[in-house]
């Protein structure tokens, strides 16, 4: 953990928005070491699946941003509960929004963002025009901001006729294996 503490300290002159997932979530004491060694903001949460996993890092103020994946967390209601638990500790949200989640989850992220007082930043993939064609109503980026659709619900829909033009092609995320064949995390 000394390496991570030193890294966080050496990154200070670069004024990172945050250092993301520097540790596995169960290493609470190591978060404390990094926190004591550096002023670089810390973000954690992609591996969390419940609000209960987040709580120890909140109550001890060991992170600055919570980065859960709303789809893995249990949806909008659970994400709002996590945000409510984080807010008294001045912890902001930075929901996980990579390219391997679809437009509906990005819609959910933005809807939570605009409904909470401790929104920080939103990781976002800007989908190509064909995705916008198939999923009208996905969040739009205009004037330096993300805008949710004003349509009911999540605001996005599926255009089934447009989807027929782009048949499904099976794809897989890489499997992370060590040289001995054992599976490890990303």
Please state what every model-predicted region is:
Residues 1-2:
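Short, small-residue-biased leader/transition segments that mark boundaries at the very start
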Residues 6:
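Short glycine/proline-centered loop/turn elements that form peptide/ligand docking sites
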Residues 154-186:
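Extended hydrophobic packing segments that form well-structured cores
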């Amino acid at each position: 953990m000394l390496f991570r503490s030193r890294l966080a300290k050496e990154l200070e002159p670069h004024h990172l928005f945050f250092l993301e997932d520097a540790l596995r979530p169960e290493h609470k004491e190591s978060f404390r070491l990094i926190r004591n060694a550096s002023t670089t903001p810390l973000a954690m949460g992609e591996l969390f699946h419940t609000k209960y996993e987040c709580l120890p890092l909140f109550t001890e103020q060991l992170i600055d941003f919570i980065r859960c994946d709303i789809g893995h967390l249990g949806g909008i209601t659970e994400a709002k509960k996590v945000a409510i638990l984080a807010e008294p500790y001045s912890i902001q949200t930075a929901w996980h929004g990579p390219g391997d989640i679809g437009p509906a989850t990005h819609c959910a992220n933005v809807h939570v963002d605009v409904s909470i007082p401790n929104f920080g930043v939103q990781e976002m993939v800007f989908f190509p025009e064909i995705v916008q064609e198939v999923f009208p109503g996905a969040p739009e980026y205009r004037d330096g901001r993300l805008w949710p659709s004003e349509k009911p619900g999540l605001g996005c829909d599926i255009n089934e006729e447009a989807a027929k033009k782009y048949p499904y092609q099976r794809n897989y995320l890489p499997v992370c294996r060590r040289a001995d064949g054992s599976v490890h995390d990303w």
